[in-house]
Amino acid sequence: MSEQTLFKVTVDNITIEVPAGTTILQAARQIGGAVAPPAMCYYSKLQGSGGKCRTCLVEVSKGSEKDPRPMPKLVASCRTTVMDGMEVKNITSEKVIDARAGIVEFLLLNHPLDCPICDQAGECHLQDLSFEHGKSSTRYEFQRRTFKKHDLGKHIQLHMTRCILCYRCVFTADQLTNKRVHGILDRGDHAEIATHIEKSLDNDFIGNVIDVCPVGALTDKTFRFKNRVWFLKPMDAHRDCPTCSGRVTLWNRGDEVFRVTARKDEWGEIEDTPEGKPGWICNTCRFDKKHTNDWVIEGPREINRHSVIAQGHYAGKLGMTKPTETFKAVNDGRAPHLLMDIHHESEVNLPSVRLSENEGPSHGTTFNTNSNNA
């Protein structure tokens, strides 16, 4: 058996060896932290995903050892495979930072300001992306595209106005169900997720489209408006389910289970089971088993300390202790990229900006930003 070929790739001055055929995004995720580009459409468990949202664009400053020429344009890291000796710039490239801010602006062009009422708030990838890479104002002055809400069966509601057309739910239905009944209708600005004659989604695994949606476009009707994720305690649990893996996260408040989701990793994707298969869960586990006595509780879910979900969960509430080590100590000596000066990085929460003093809609031209003051 021949040995596996390894390529040496450098991402933001950090070198790692990965197998041939690995994408830049996968290599960056092995390094972790801010080095990994954001991804709104790519999902490692879904074949064919990626290449649509362009949020993972990176700069390749050196193609390979054999051909050291830089690539002339930014490339999608989720689709571009590494070459031996390749050098990639992500957060260290001004081109990437500027392009990503533009992509976020496009994604938010028709997106409603529903965060205060959206069930996805607190775990929304678009919310995180706009906070880290977005701008503090909008230049769009025209009427936004809107759609009516649709019930896609008794468990799922579609808010098409929030959708970013990442296609994740389409790939999920293609690969987990026998027959997909929803997809992308129309083209261009009129494109939307829909079913034929408003047919309901009733497959036993269709609830997984809620977990893969990076925004609040597909929501769980059984959890709708009932609670905020940062008030709930995520607990790992399992049951002997004949249909699926049975490995879930219970979101509790007191003794009440508000919702059940599949377990997710640090990238917001479905975790693999011990057998190495994706841990998709069935509708029975997701929607019908809402009592703690239905499950074997394994213990508290590990939470990223910087997540809003972690608030109030330290000092024993989830069996956790408040961390005392510094950020650099747990990130190989690297300082936090965004926490160094978040106002300068994203122009969000700029202290000198008082939107209430502006007459009419606030735009970038109505107040000075950090970039103007630089």
Regions found by a protein language model. Give the residues of each.
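Short, glycine/charge-rich beta-strand/loop segments that flank catalytic centers
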Residues: 43-44, 116-126
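N-terminal cofactor/phosphate-binding cores enriched in small/glycine residues
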Residues: 7-9, 13-84, 94
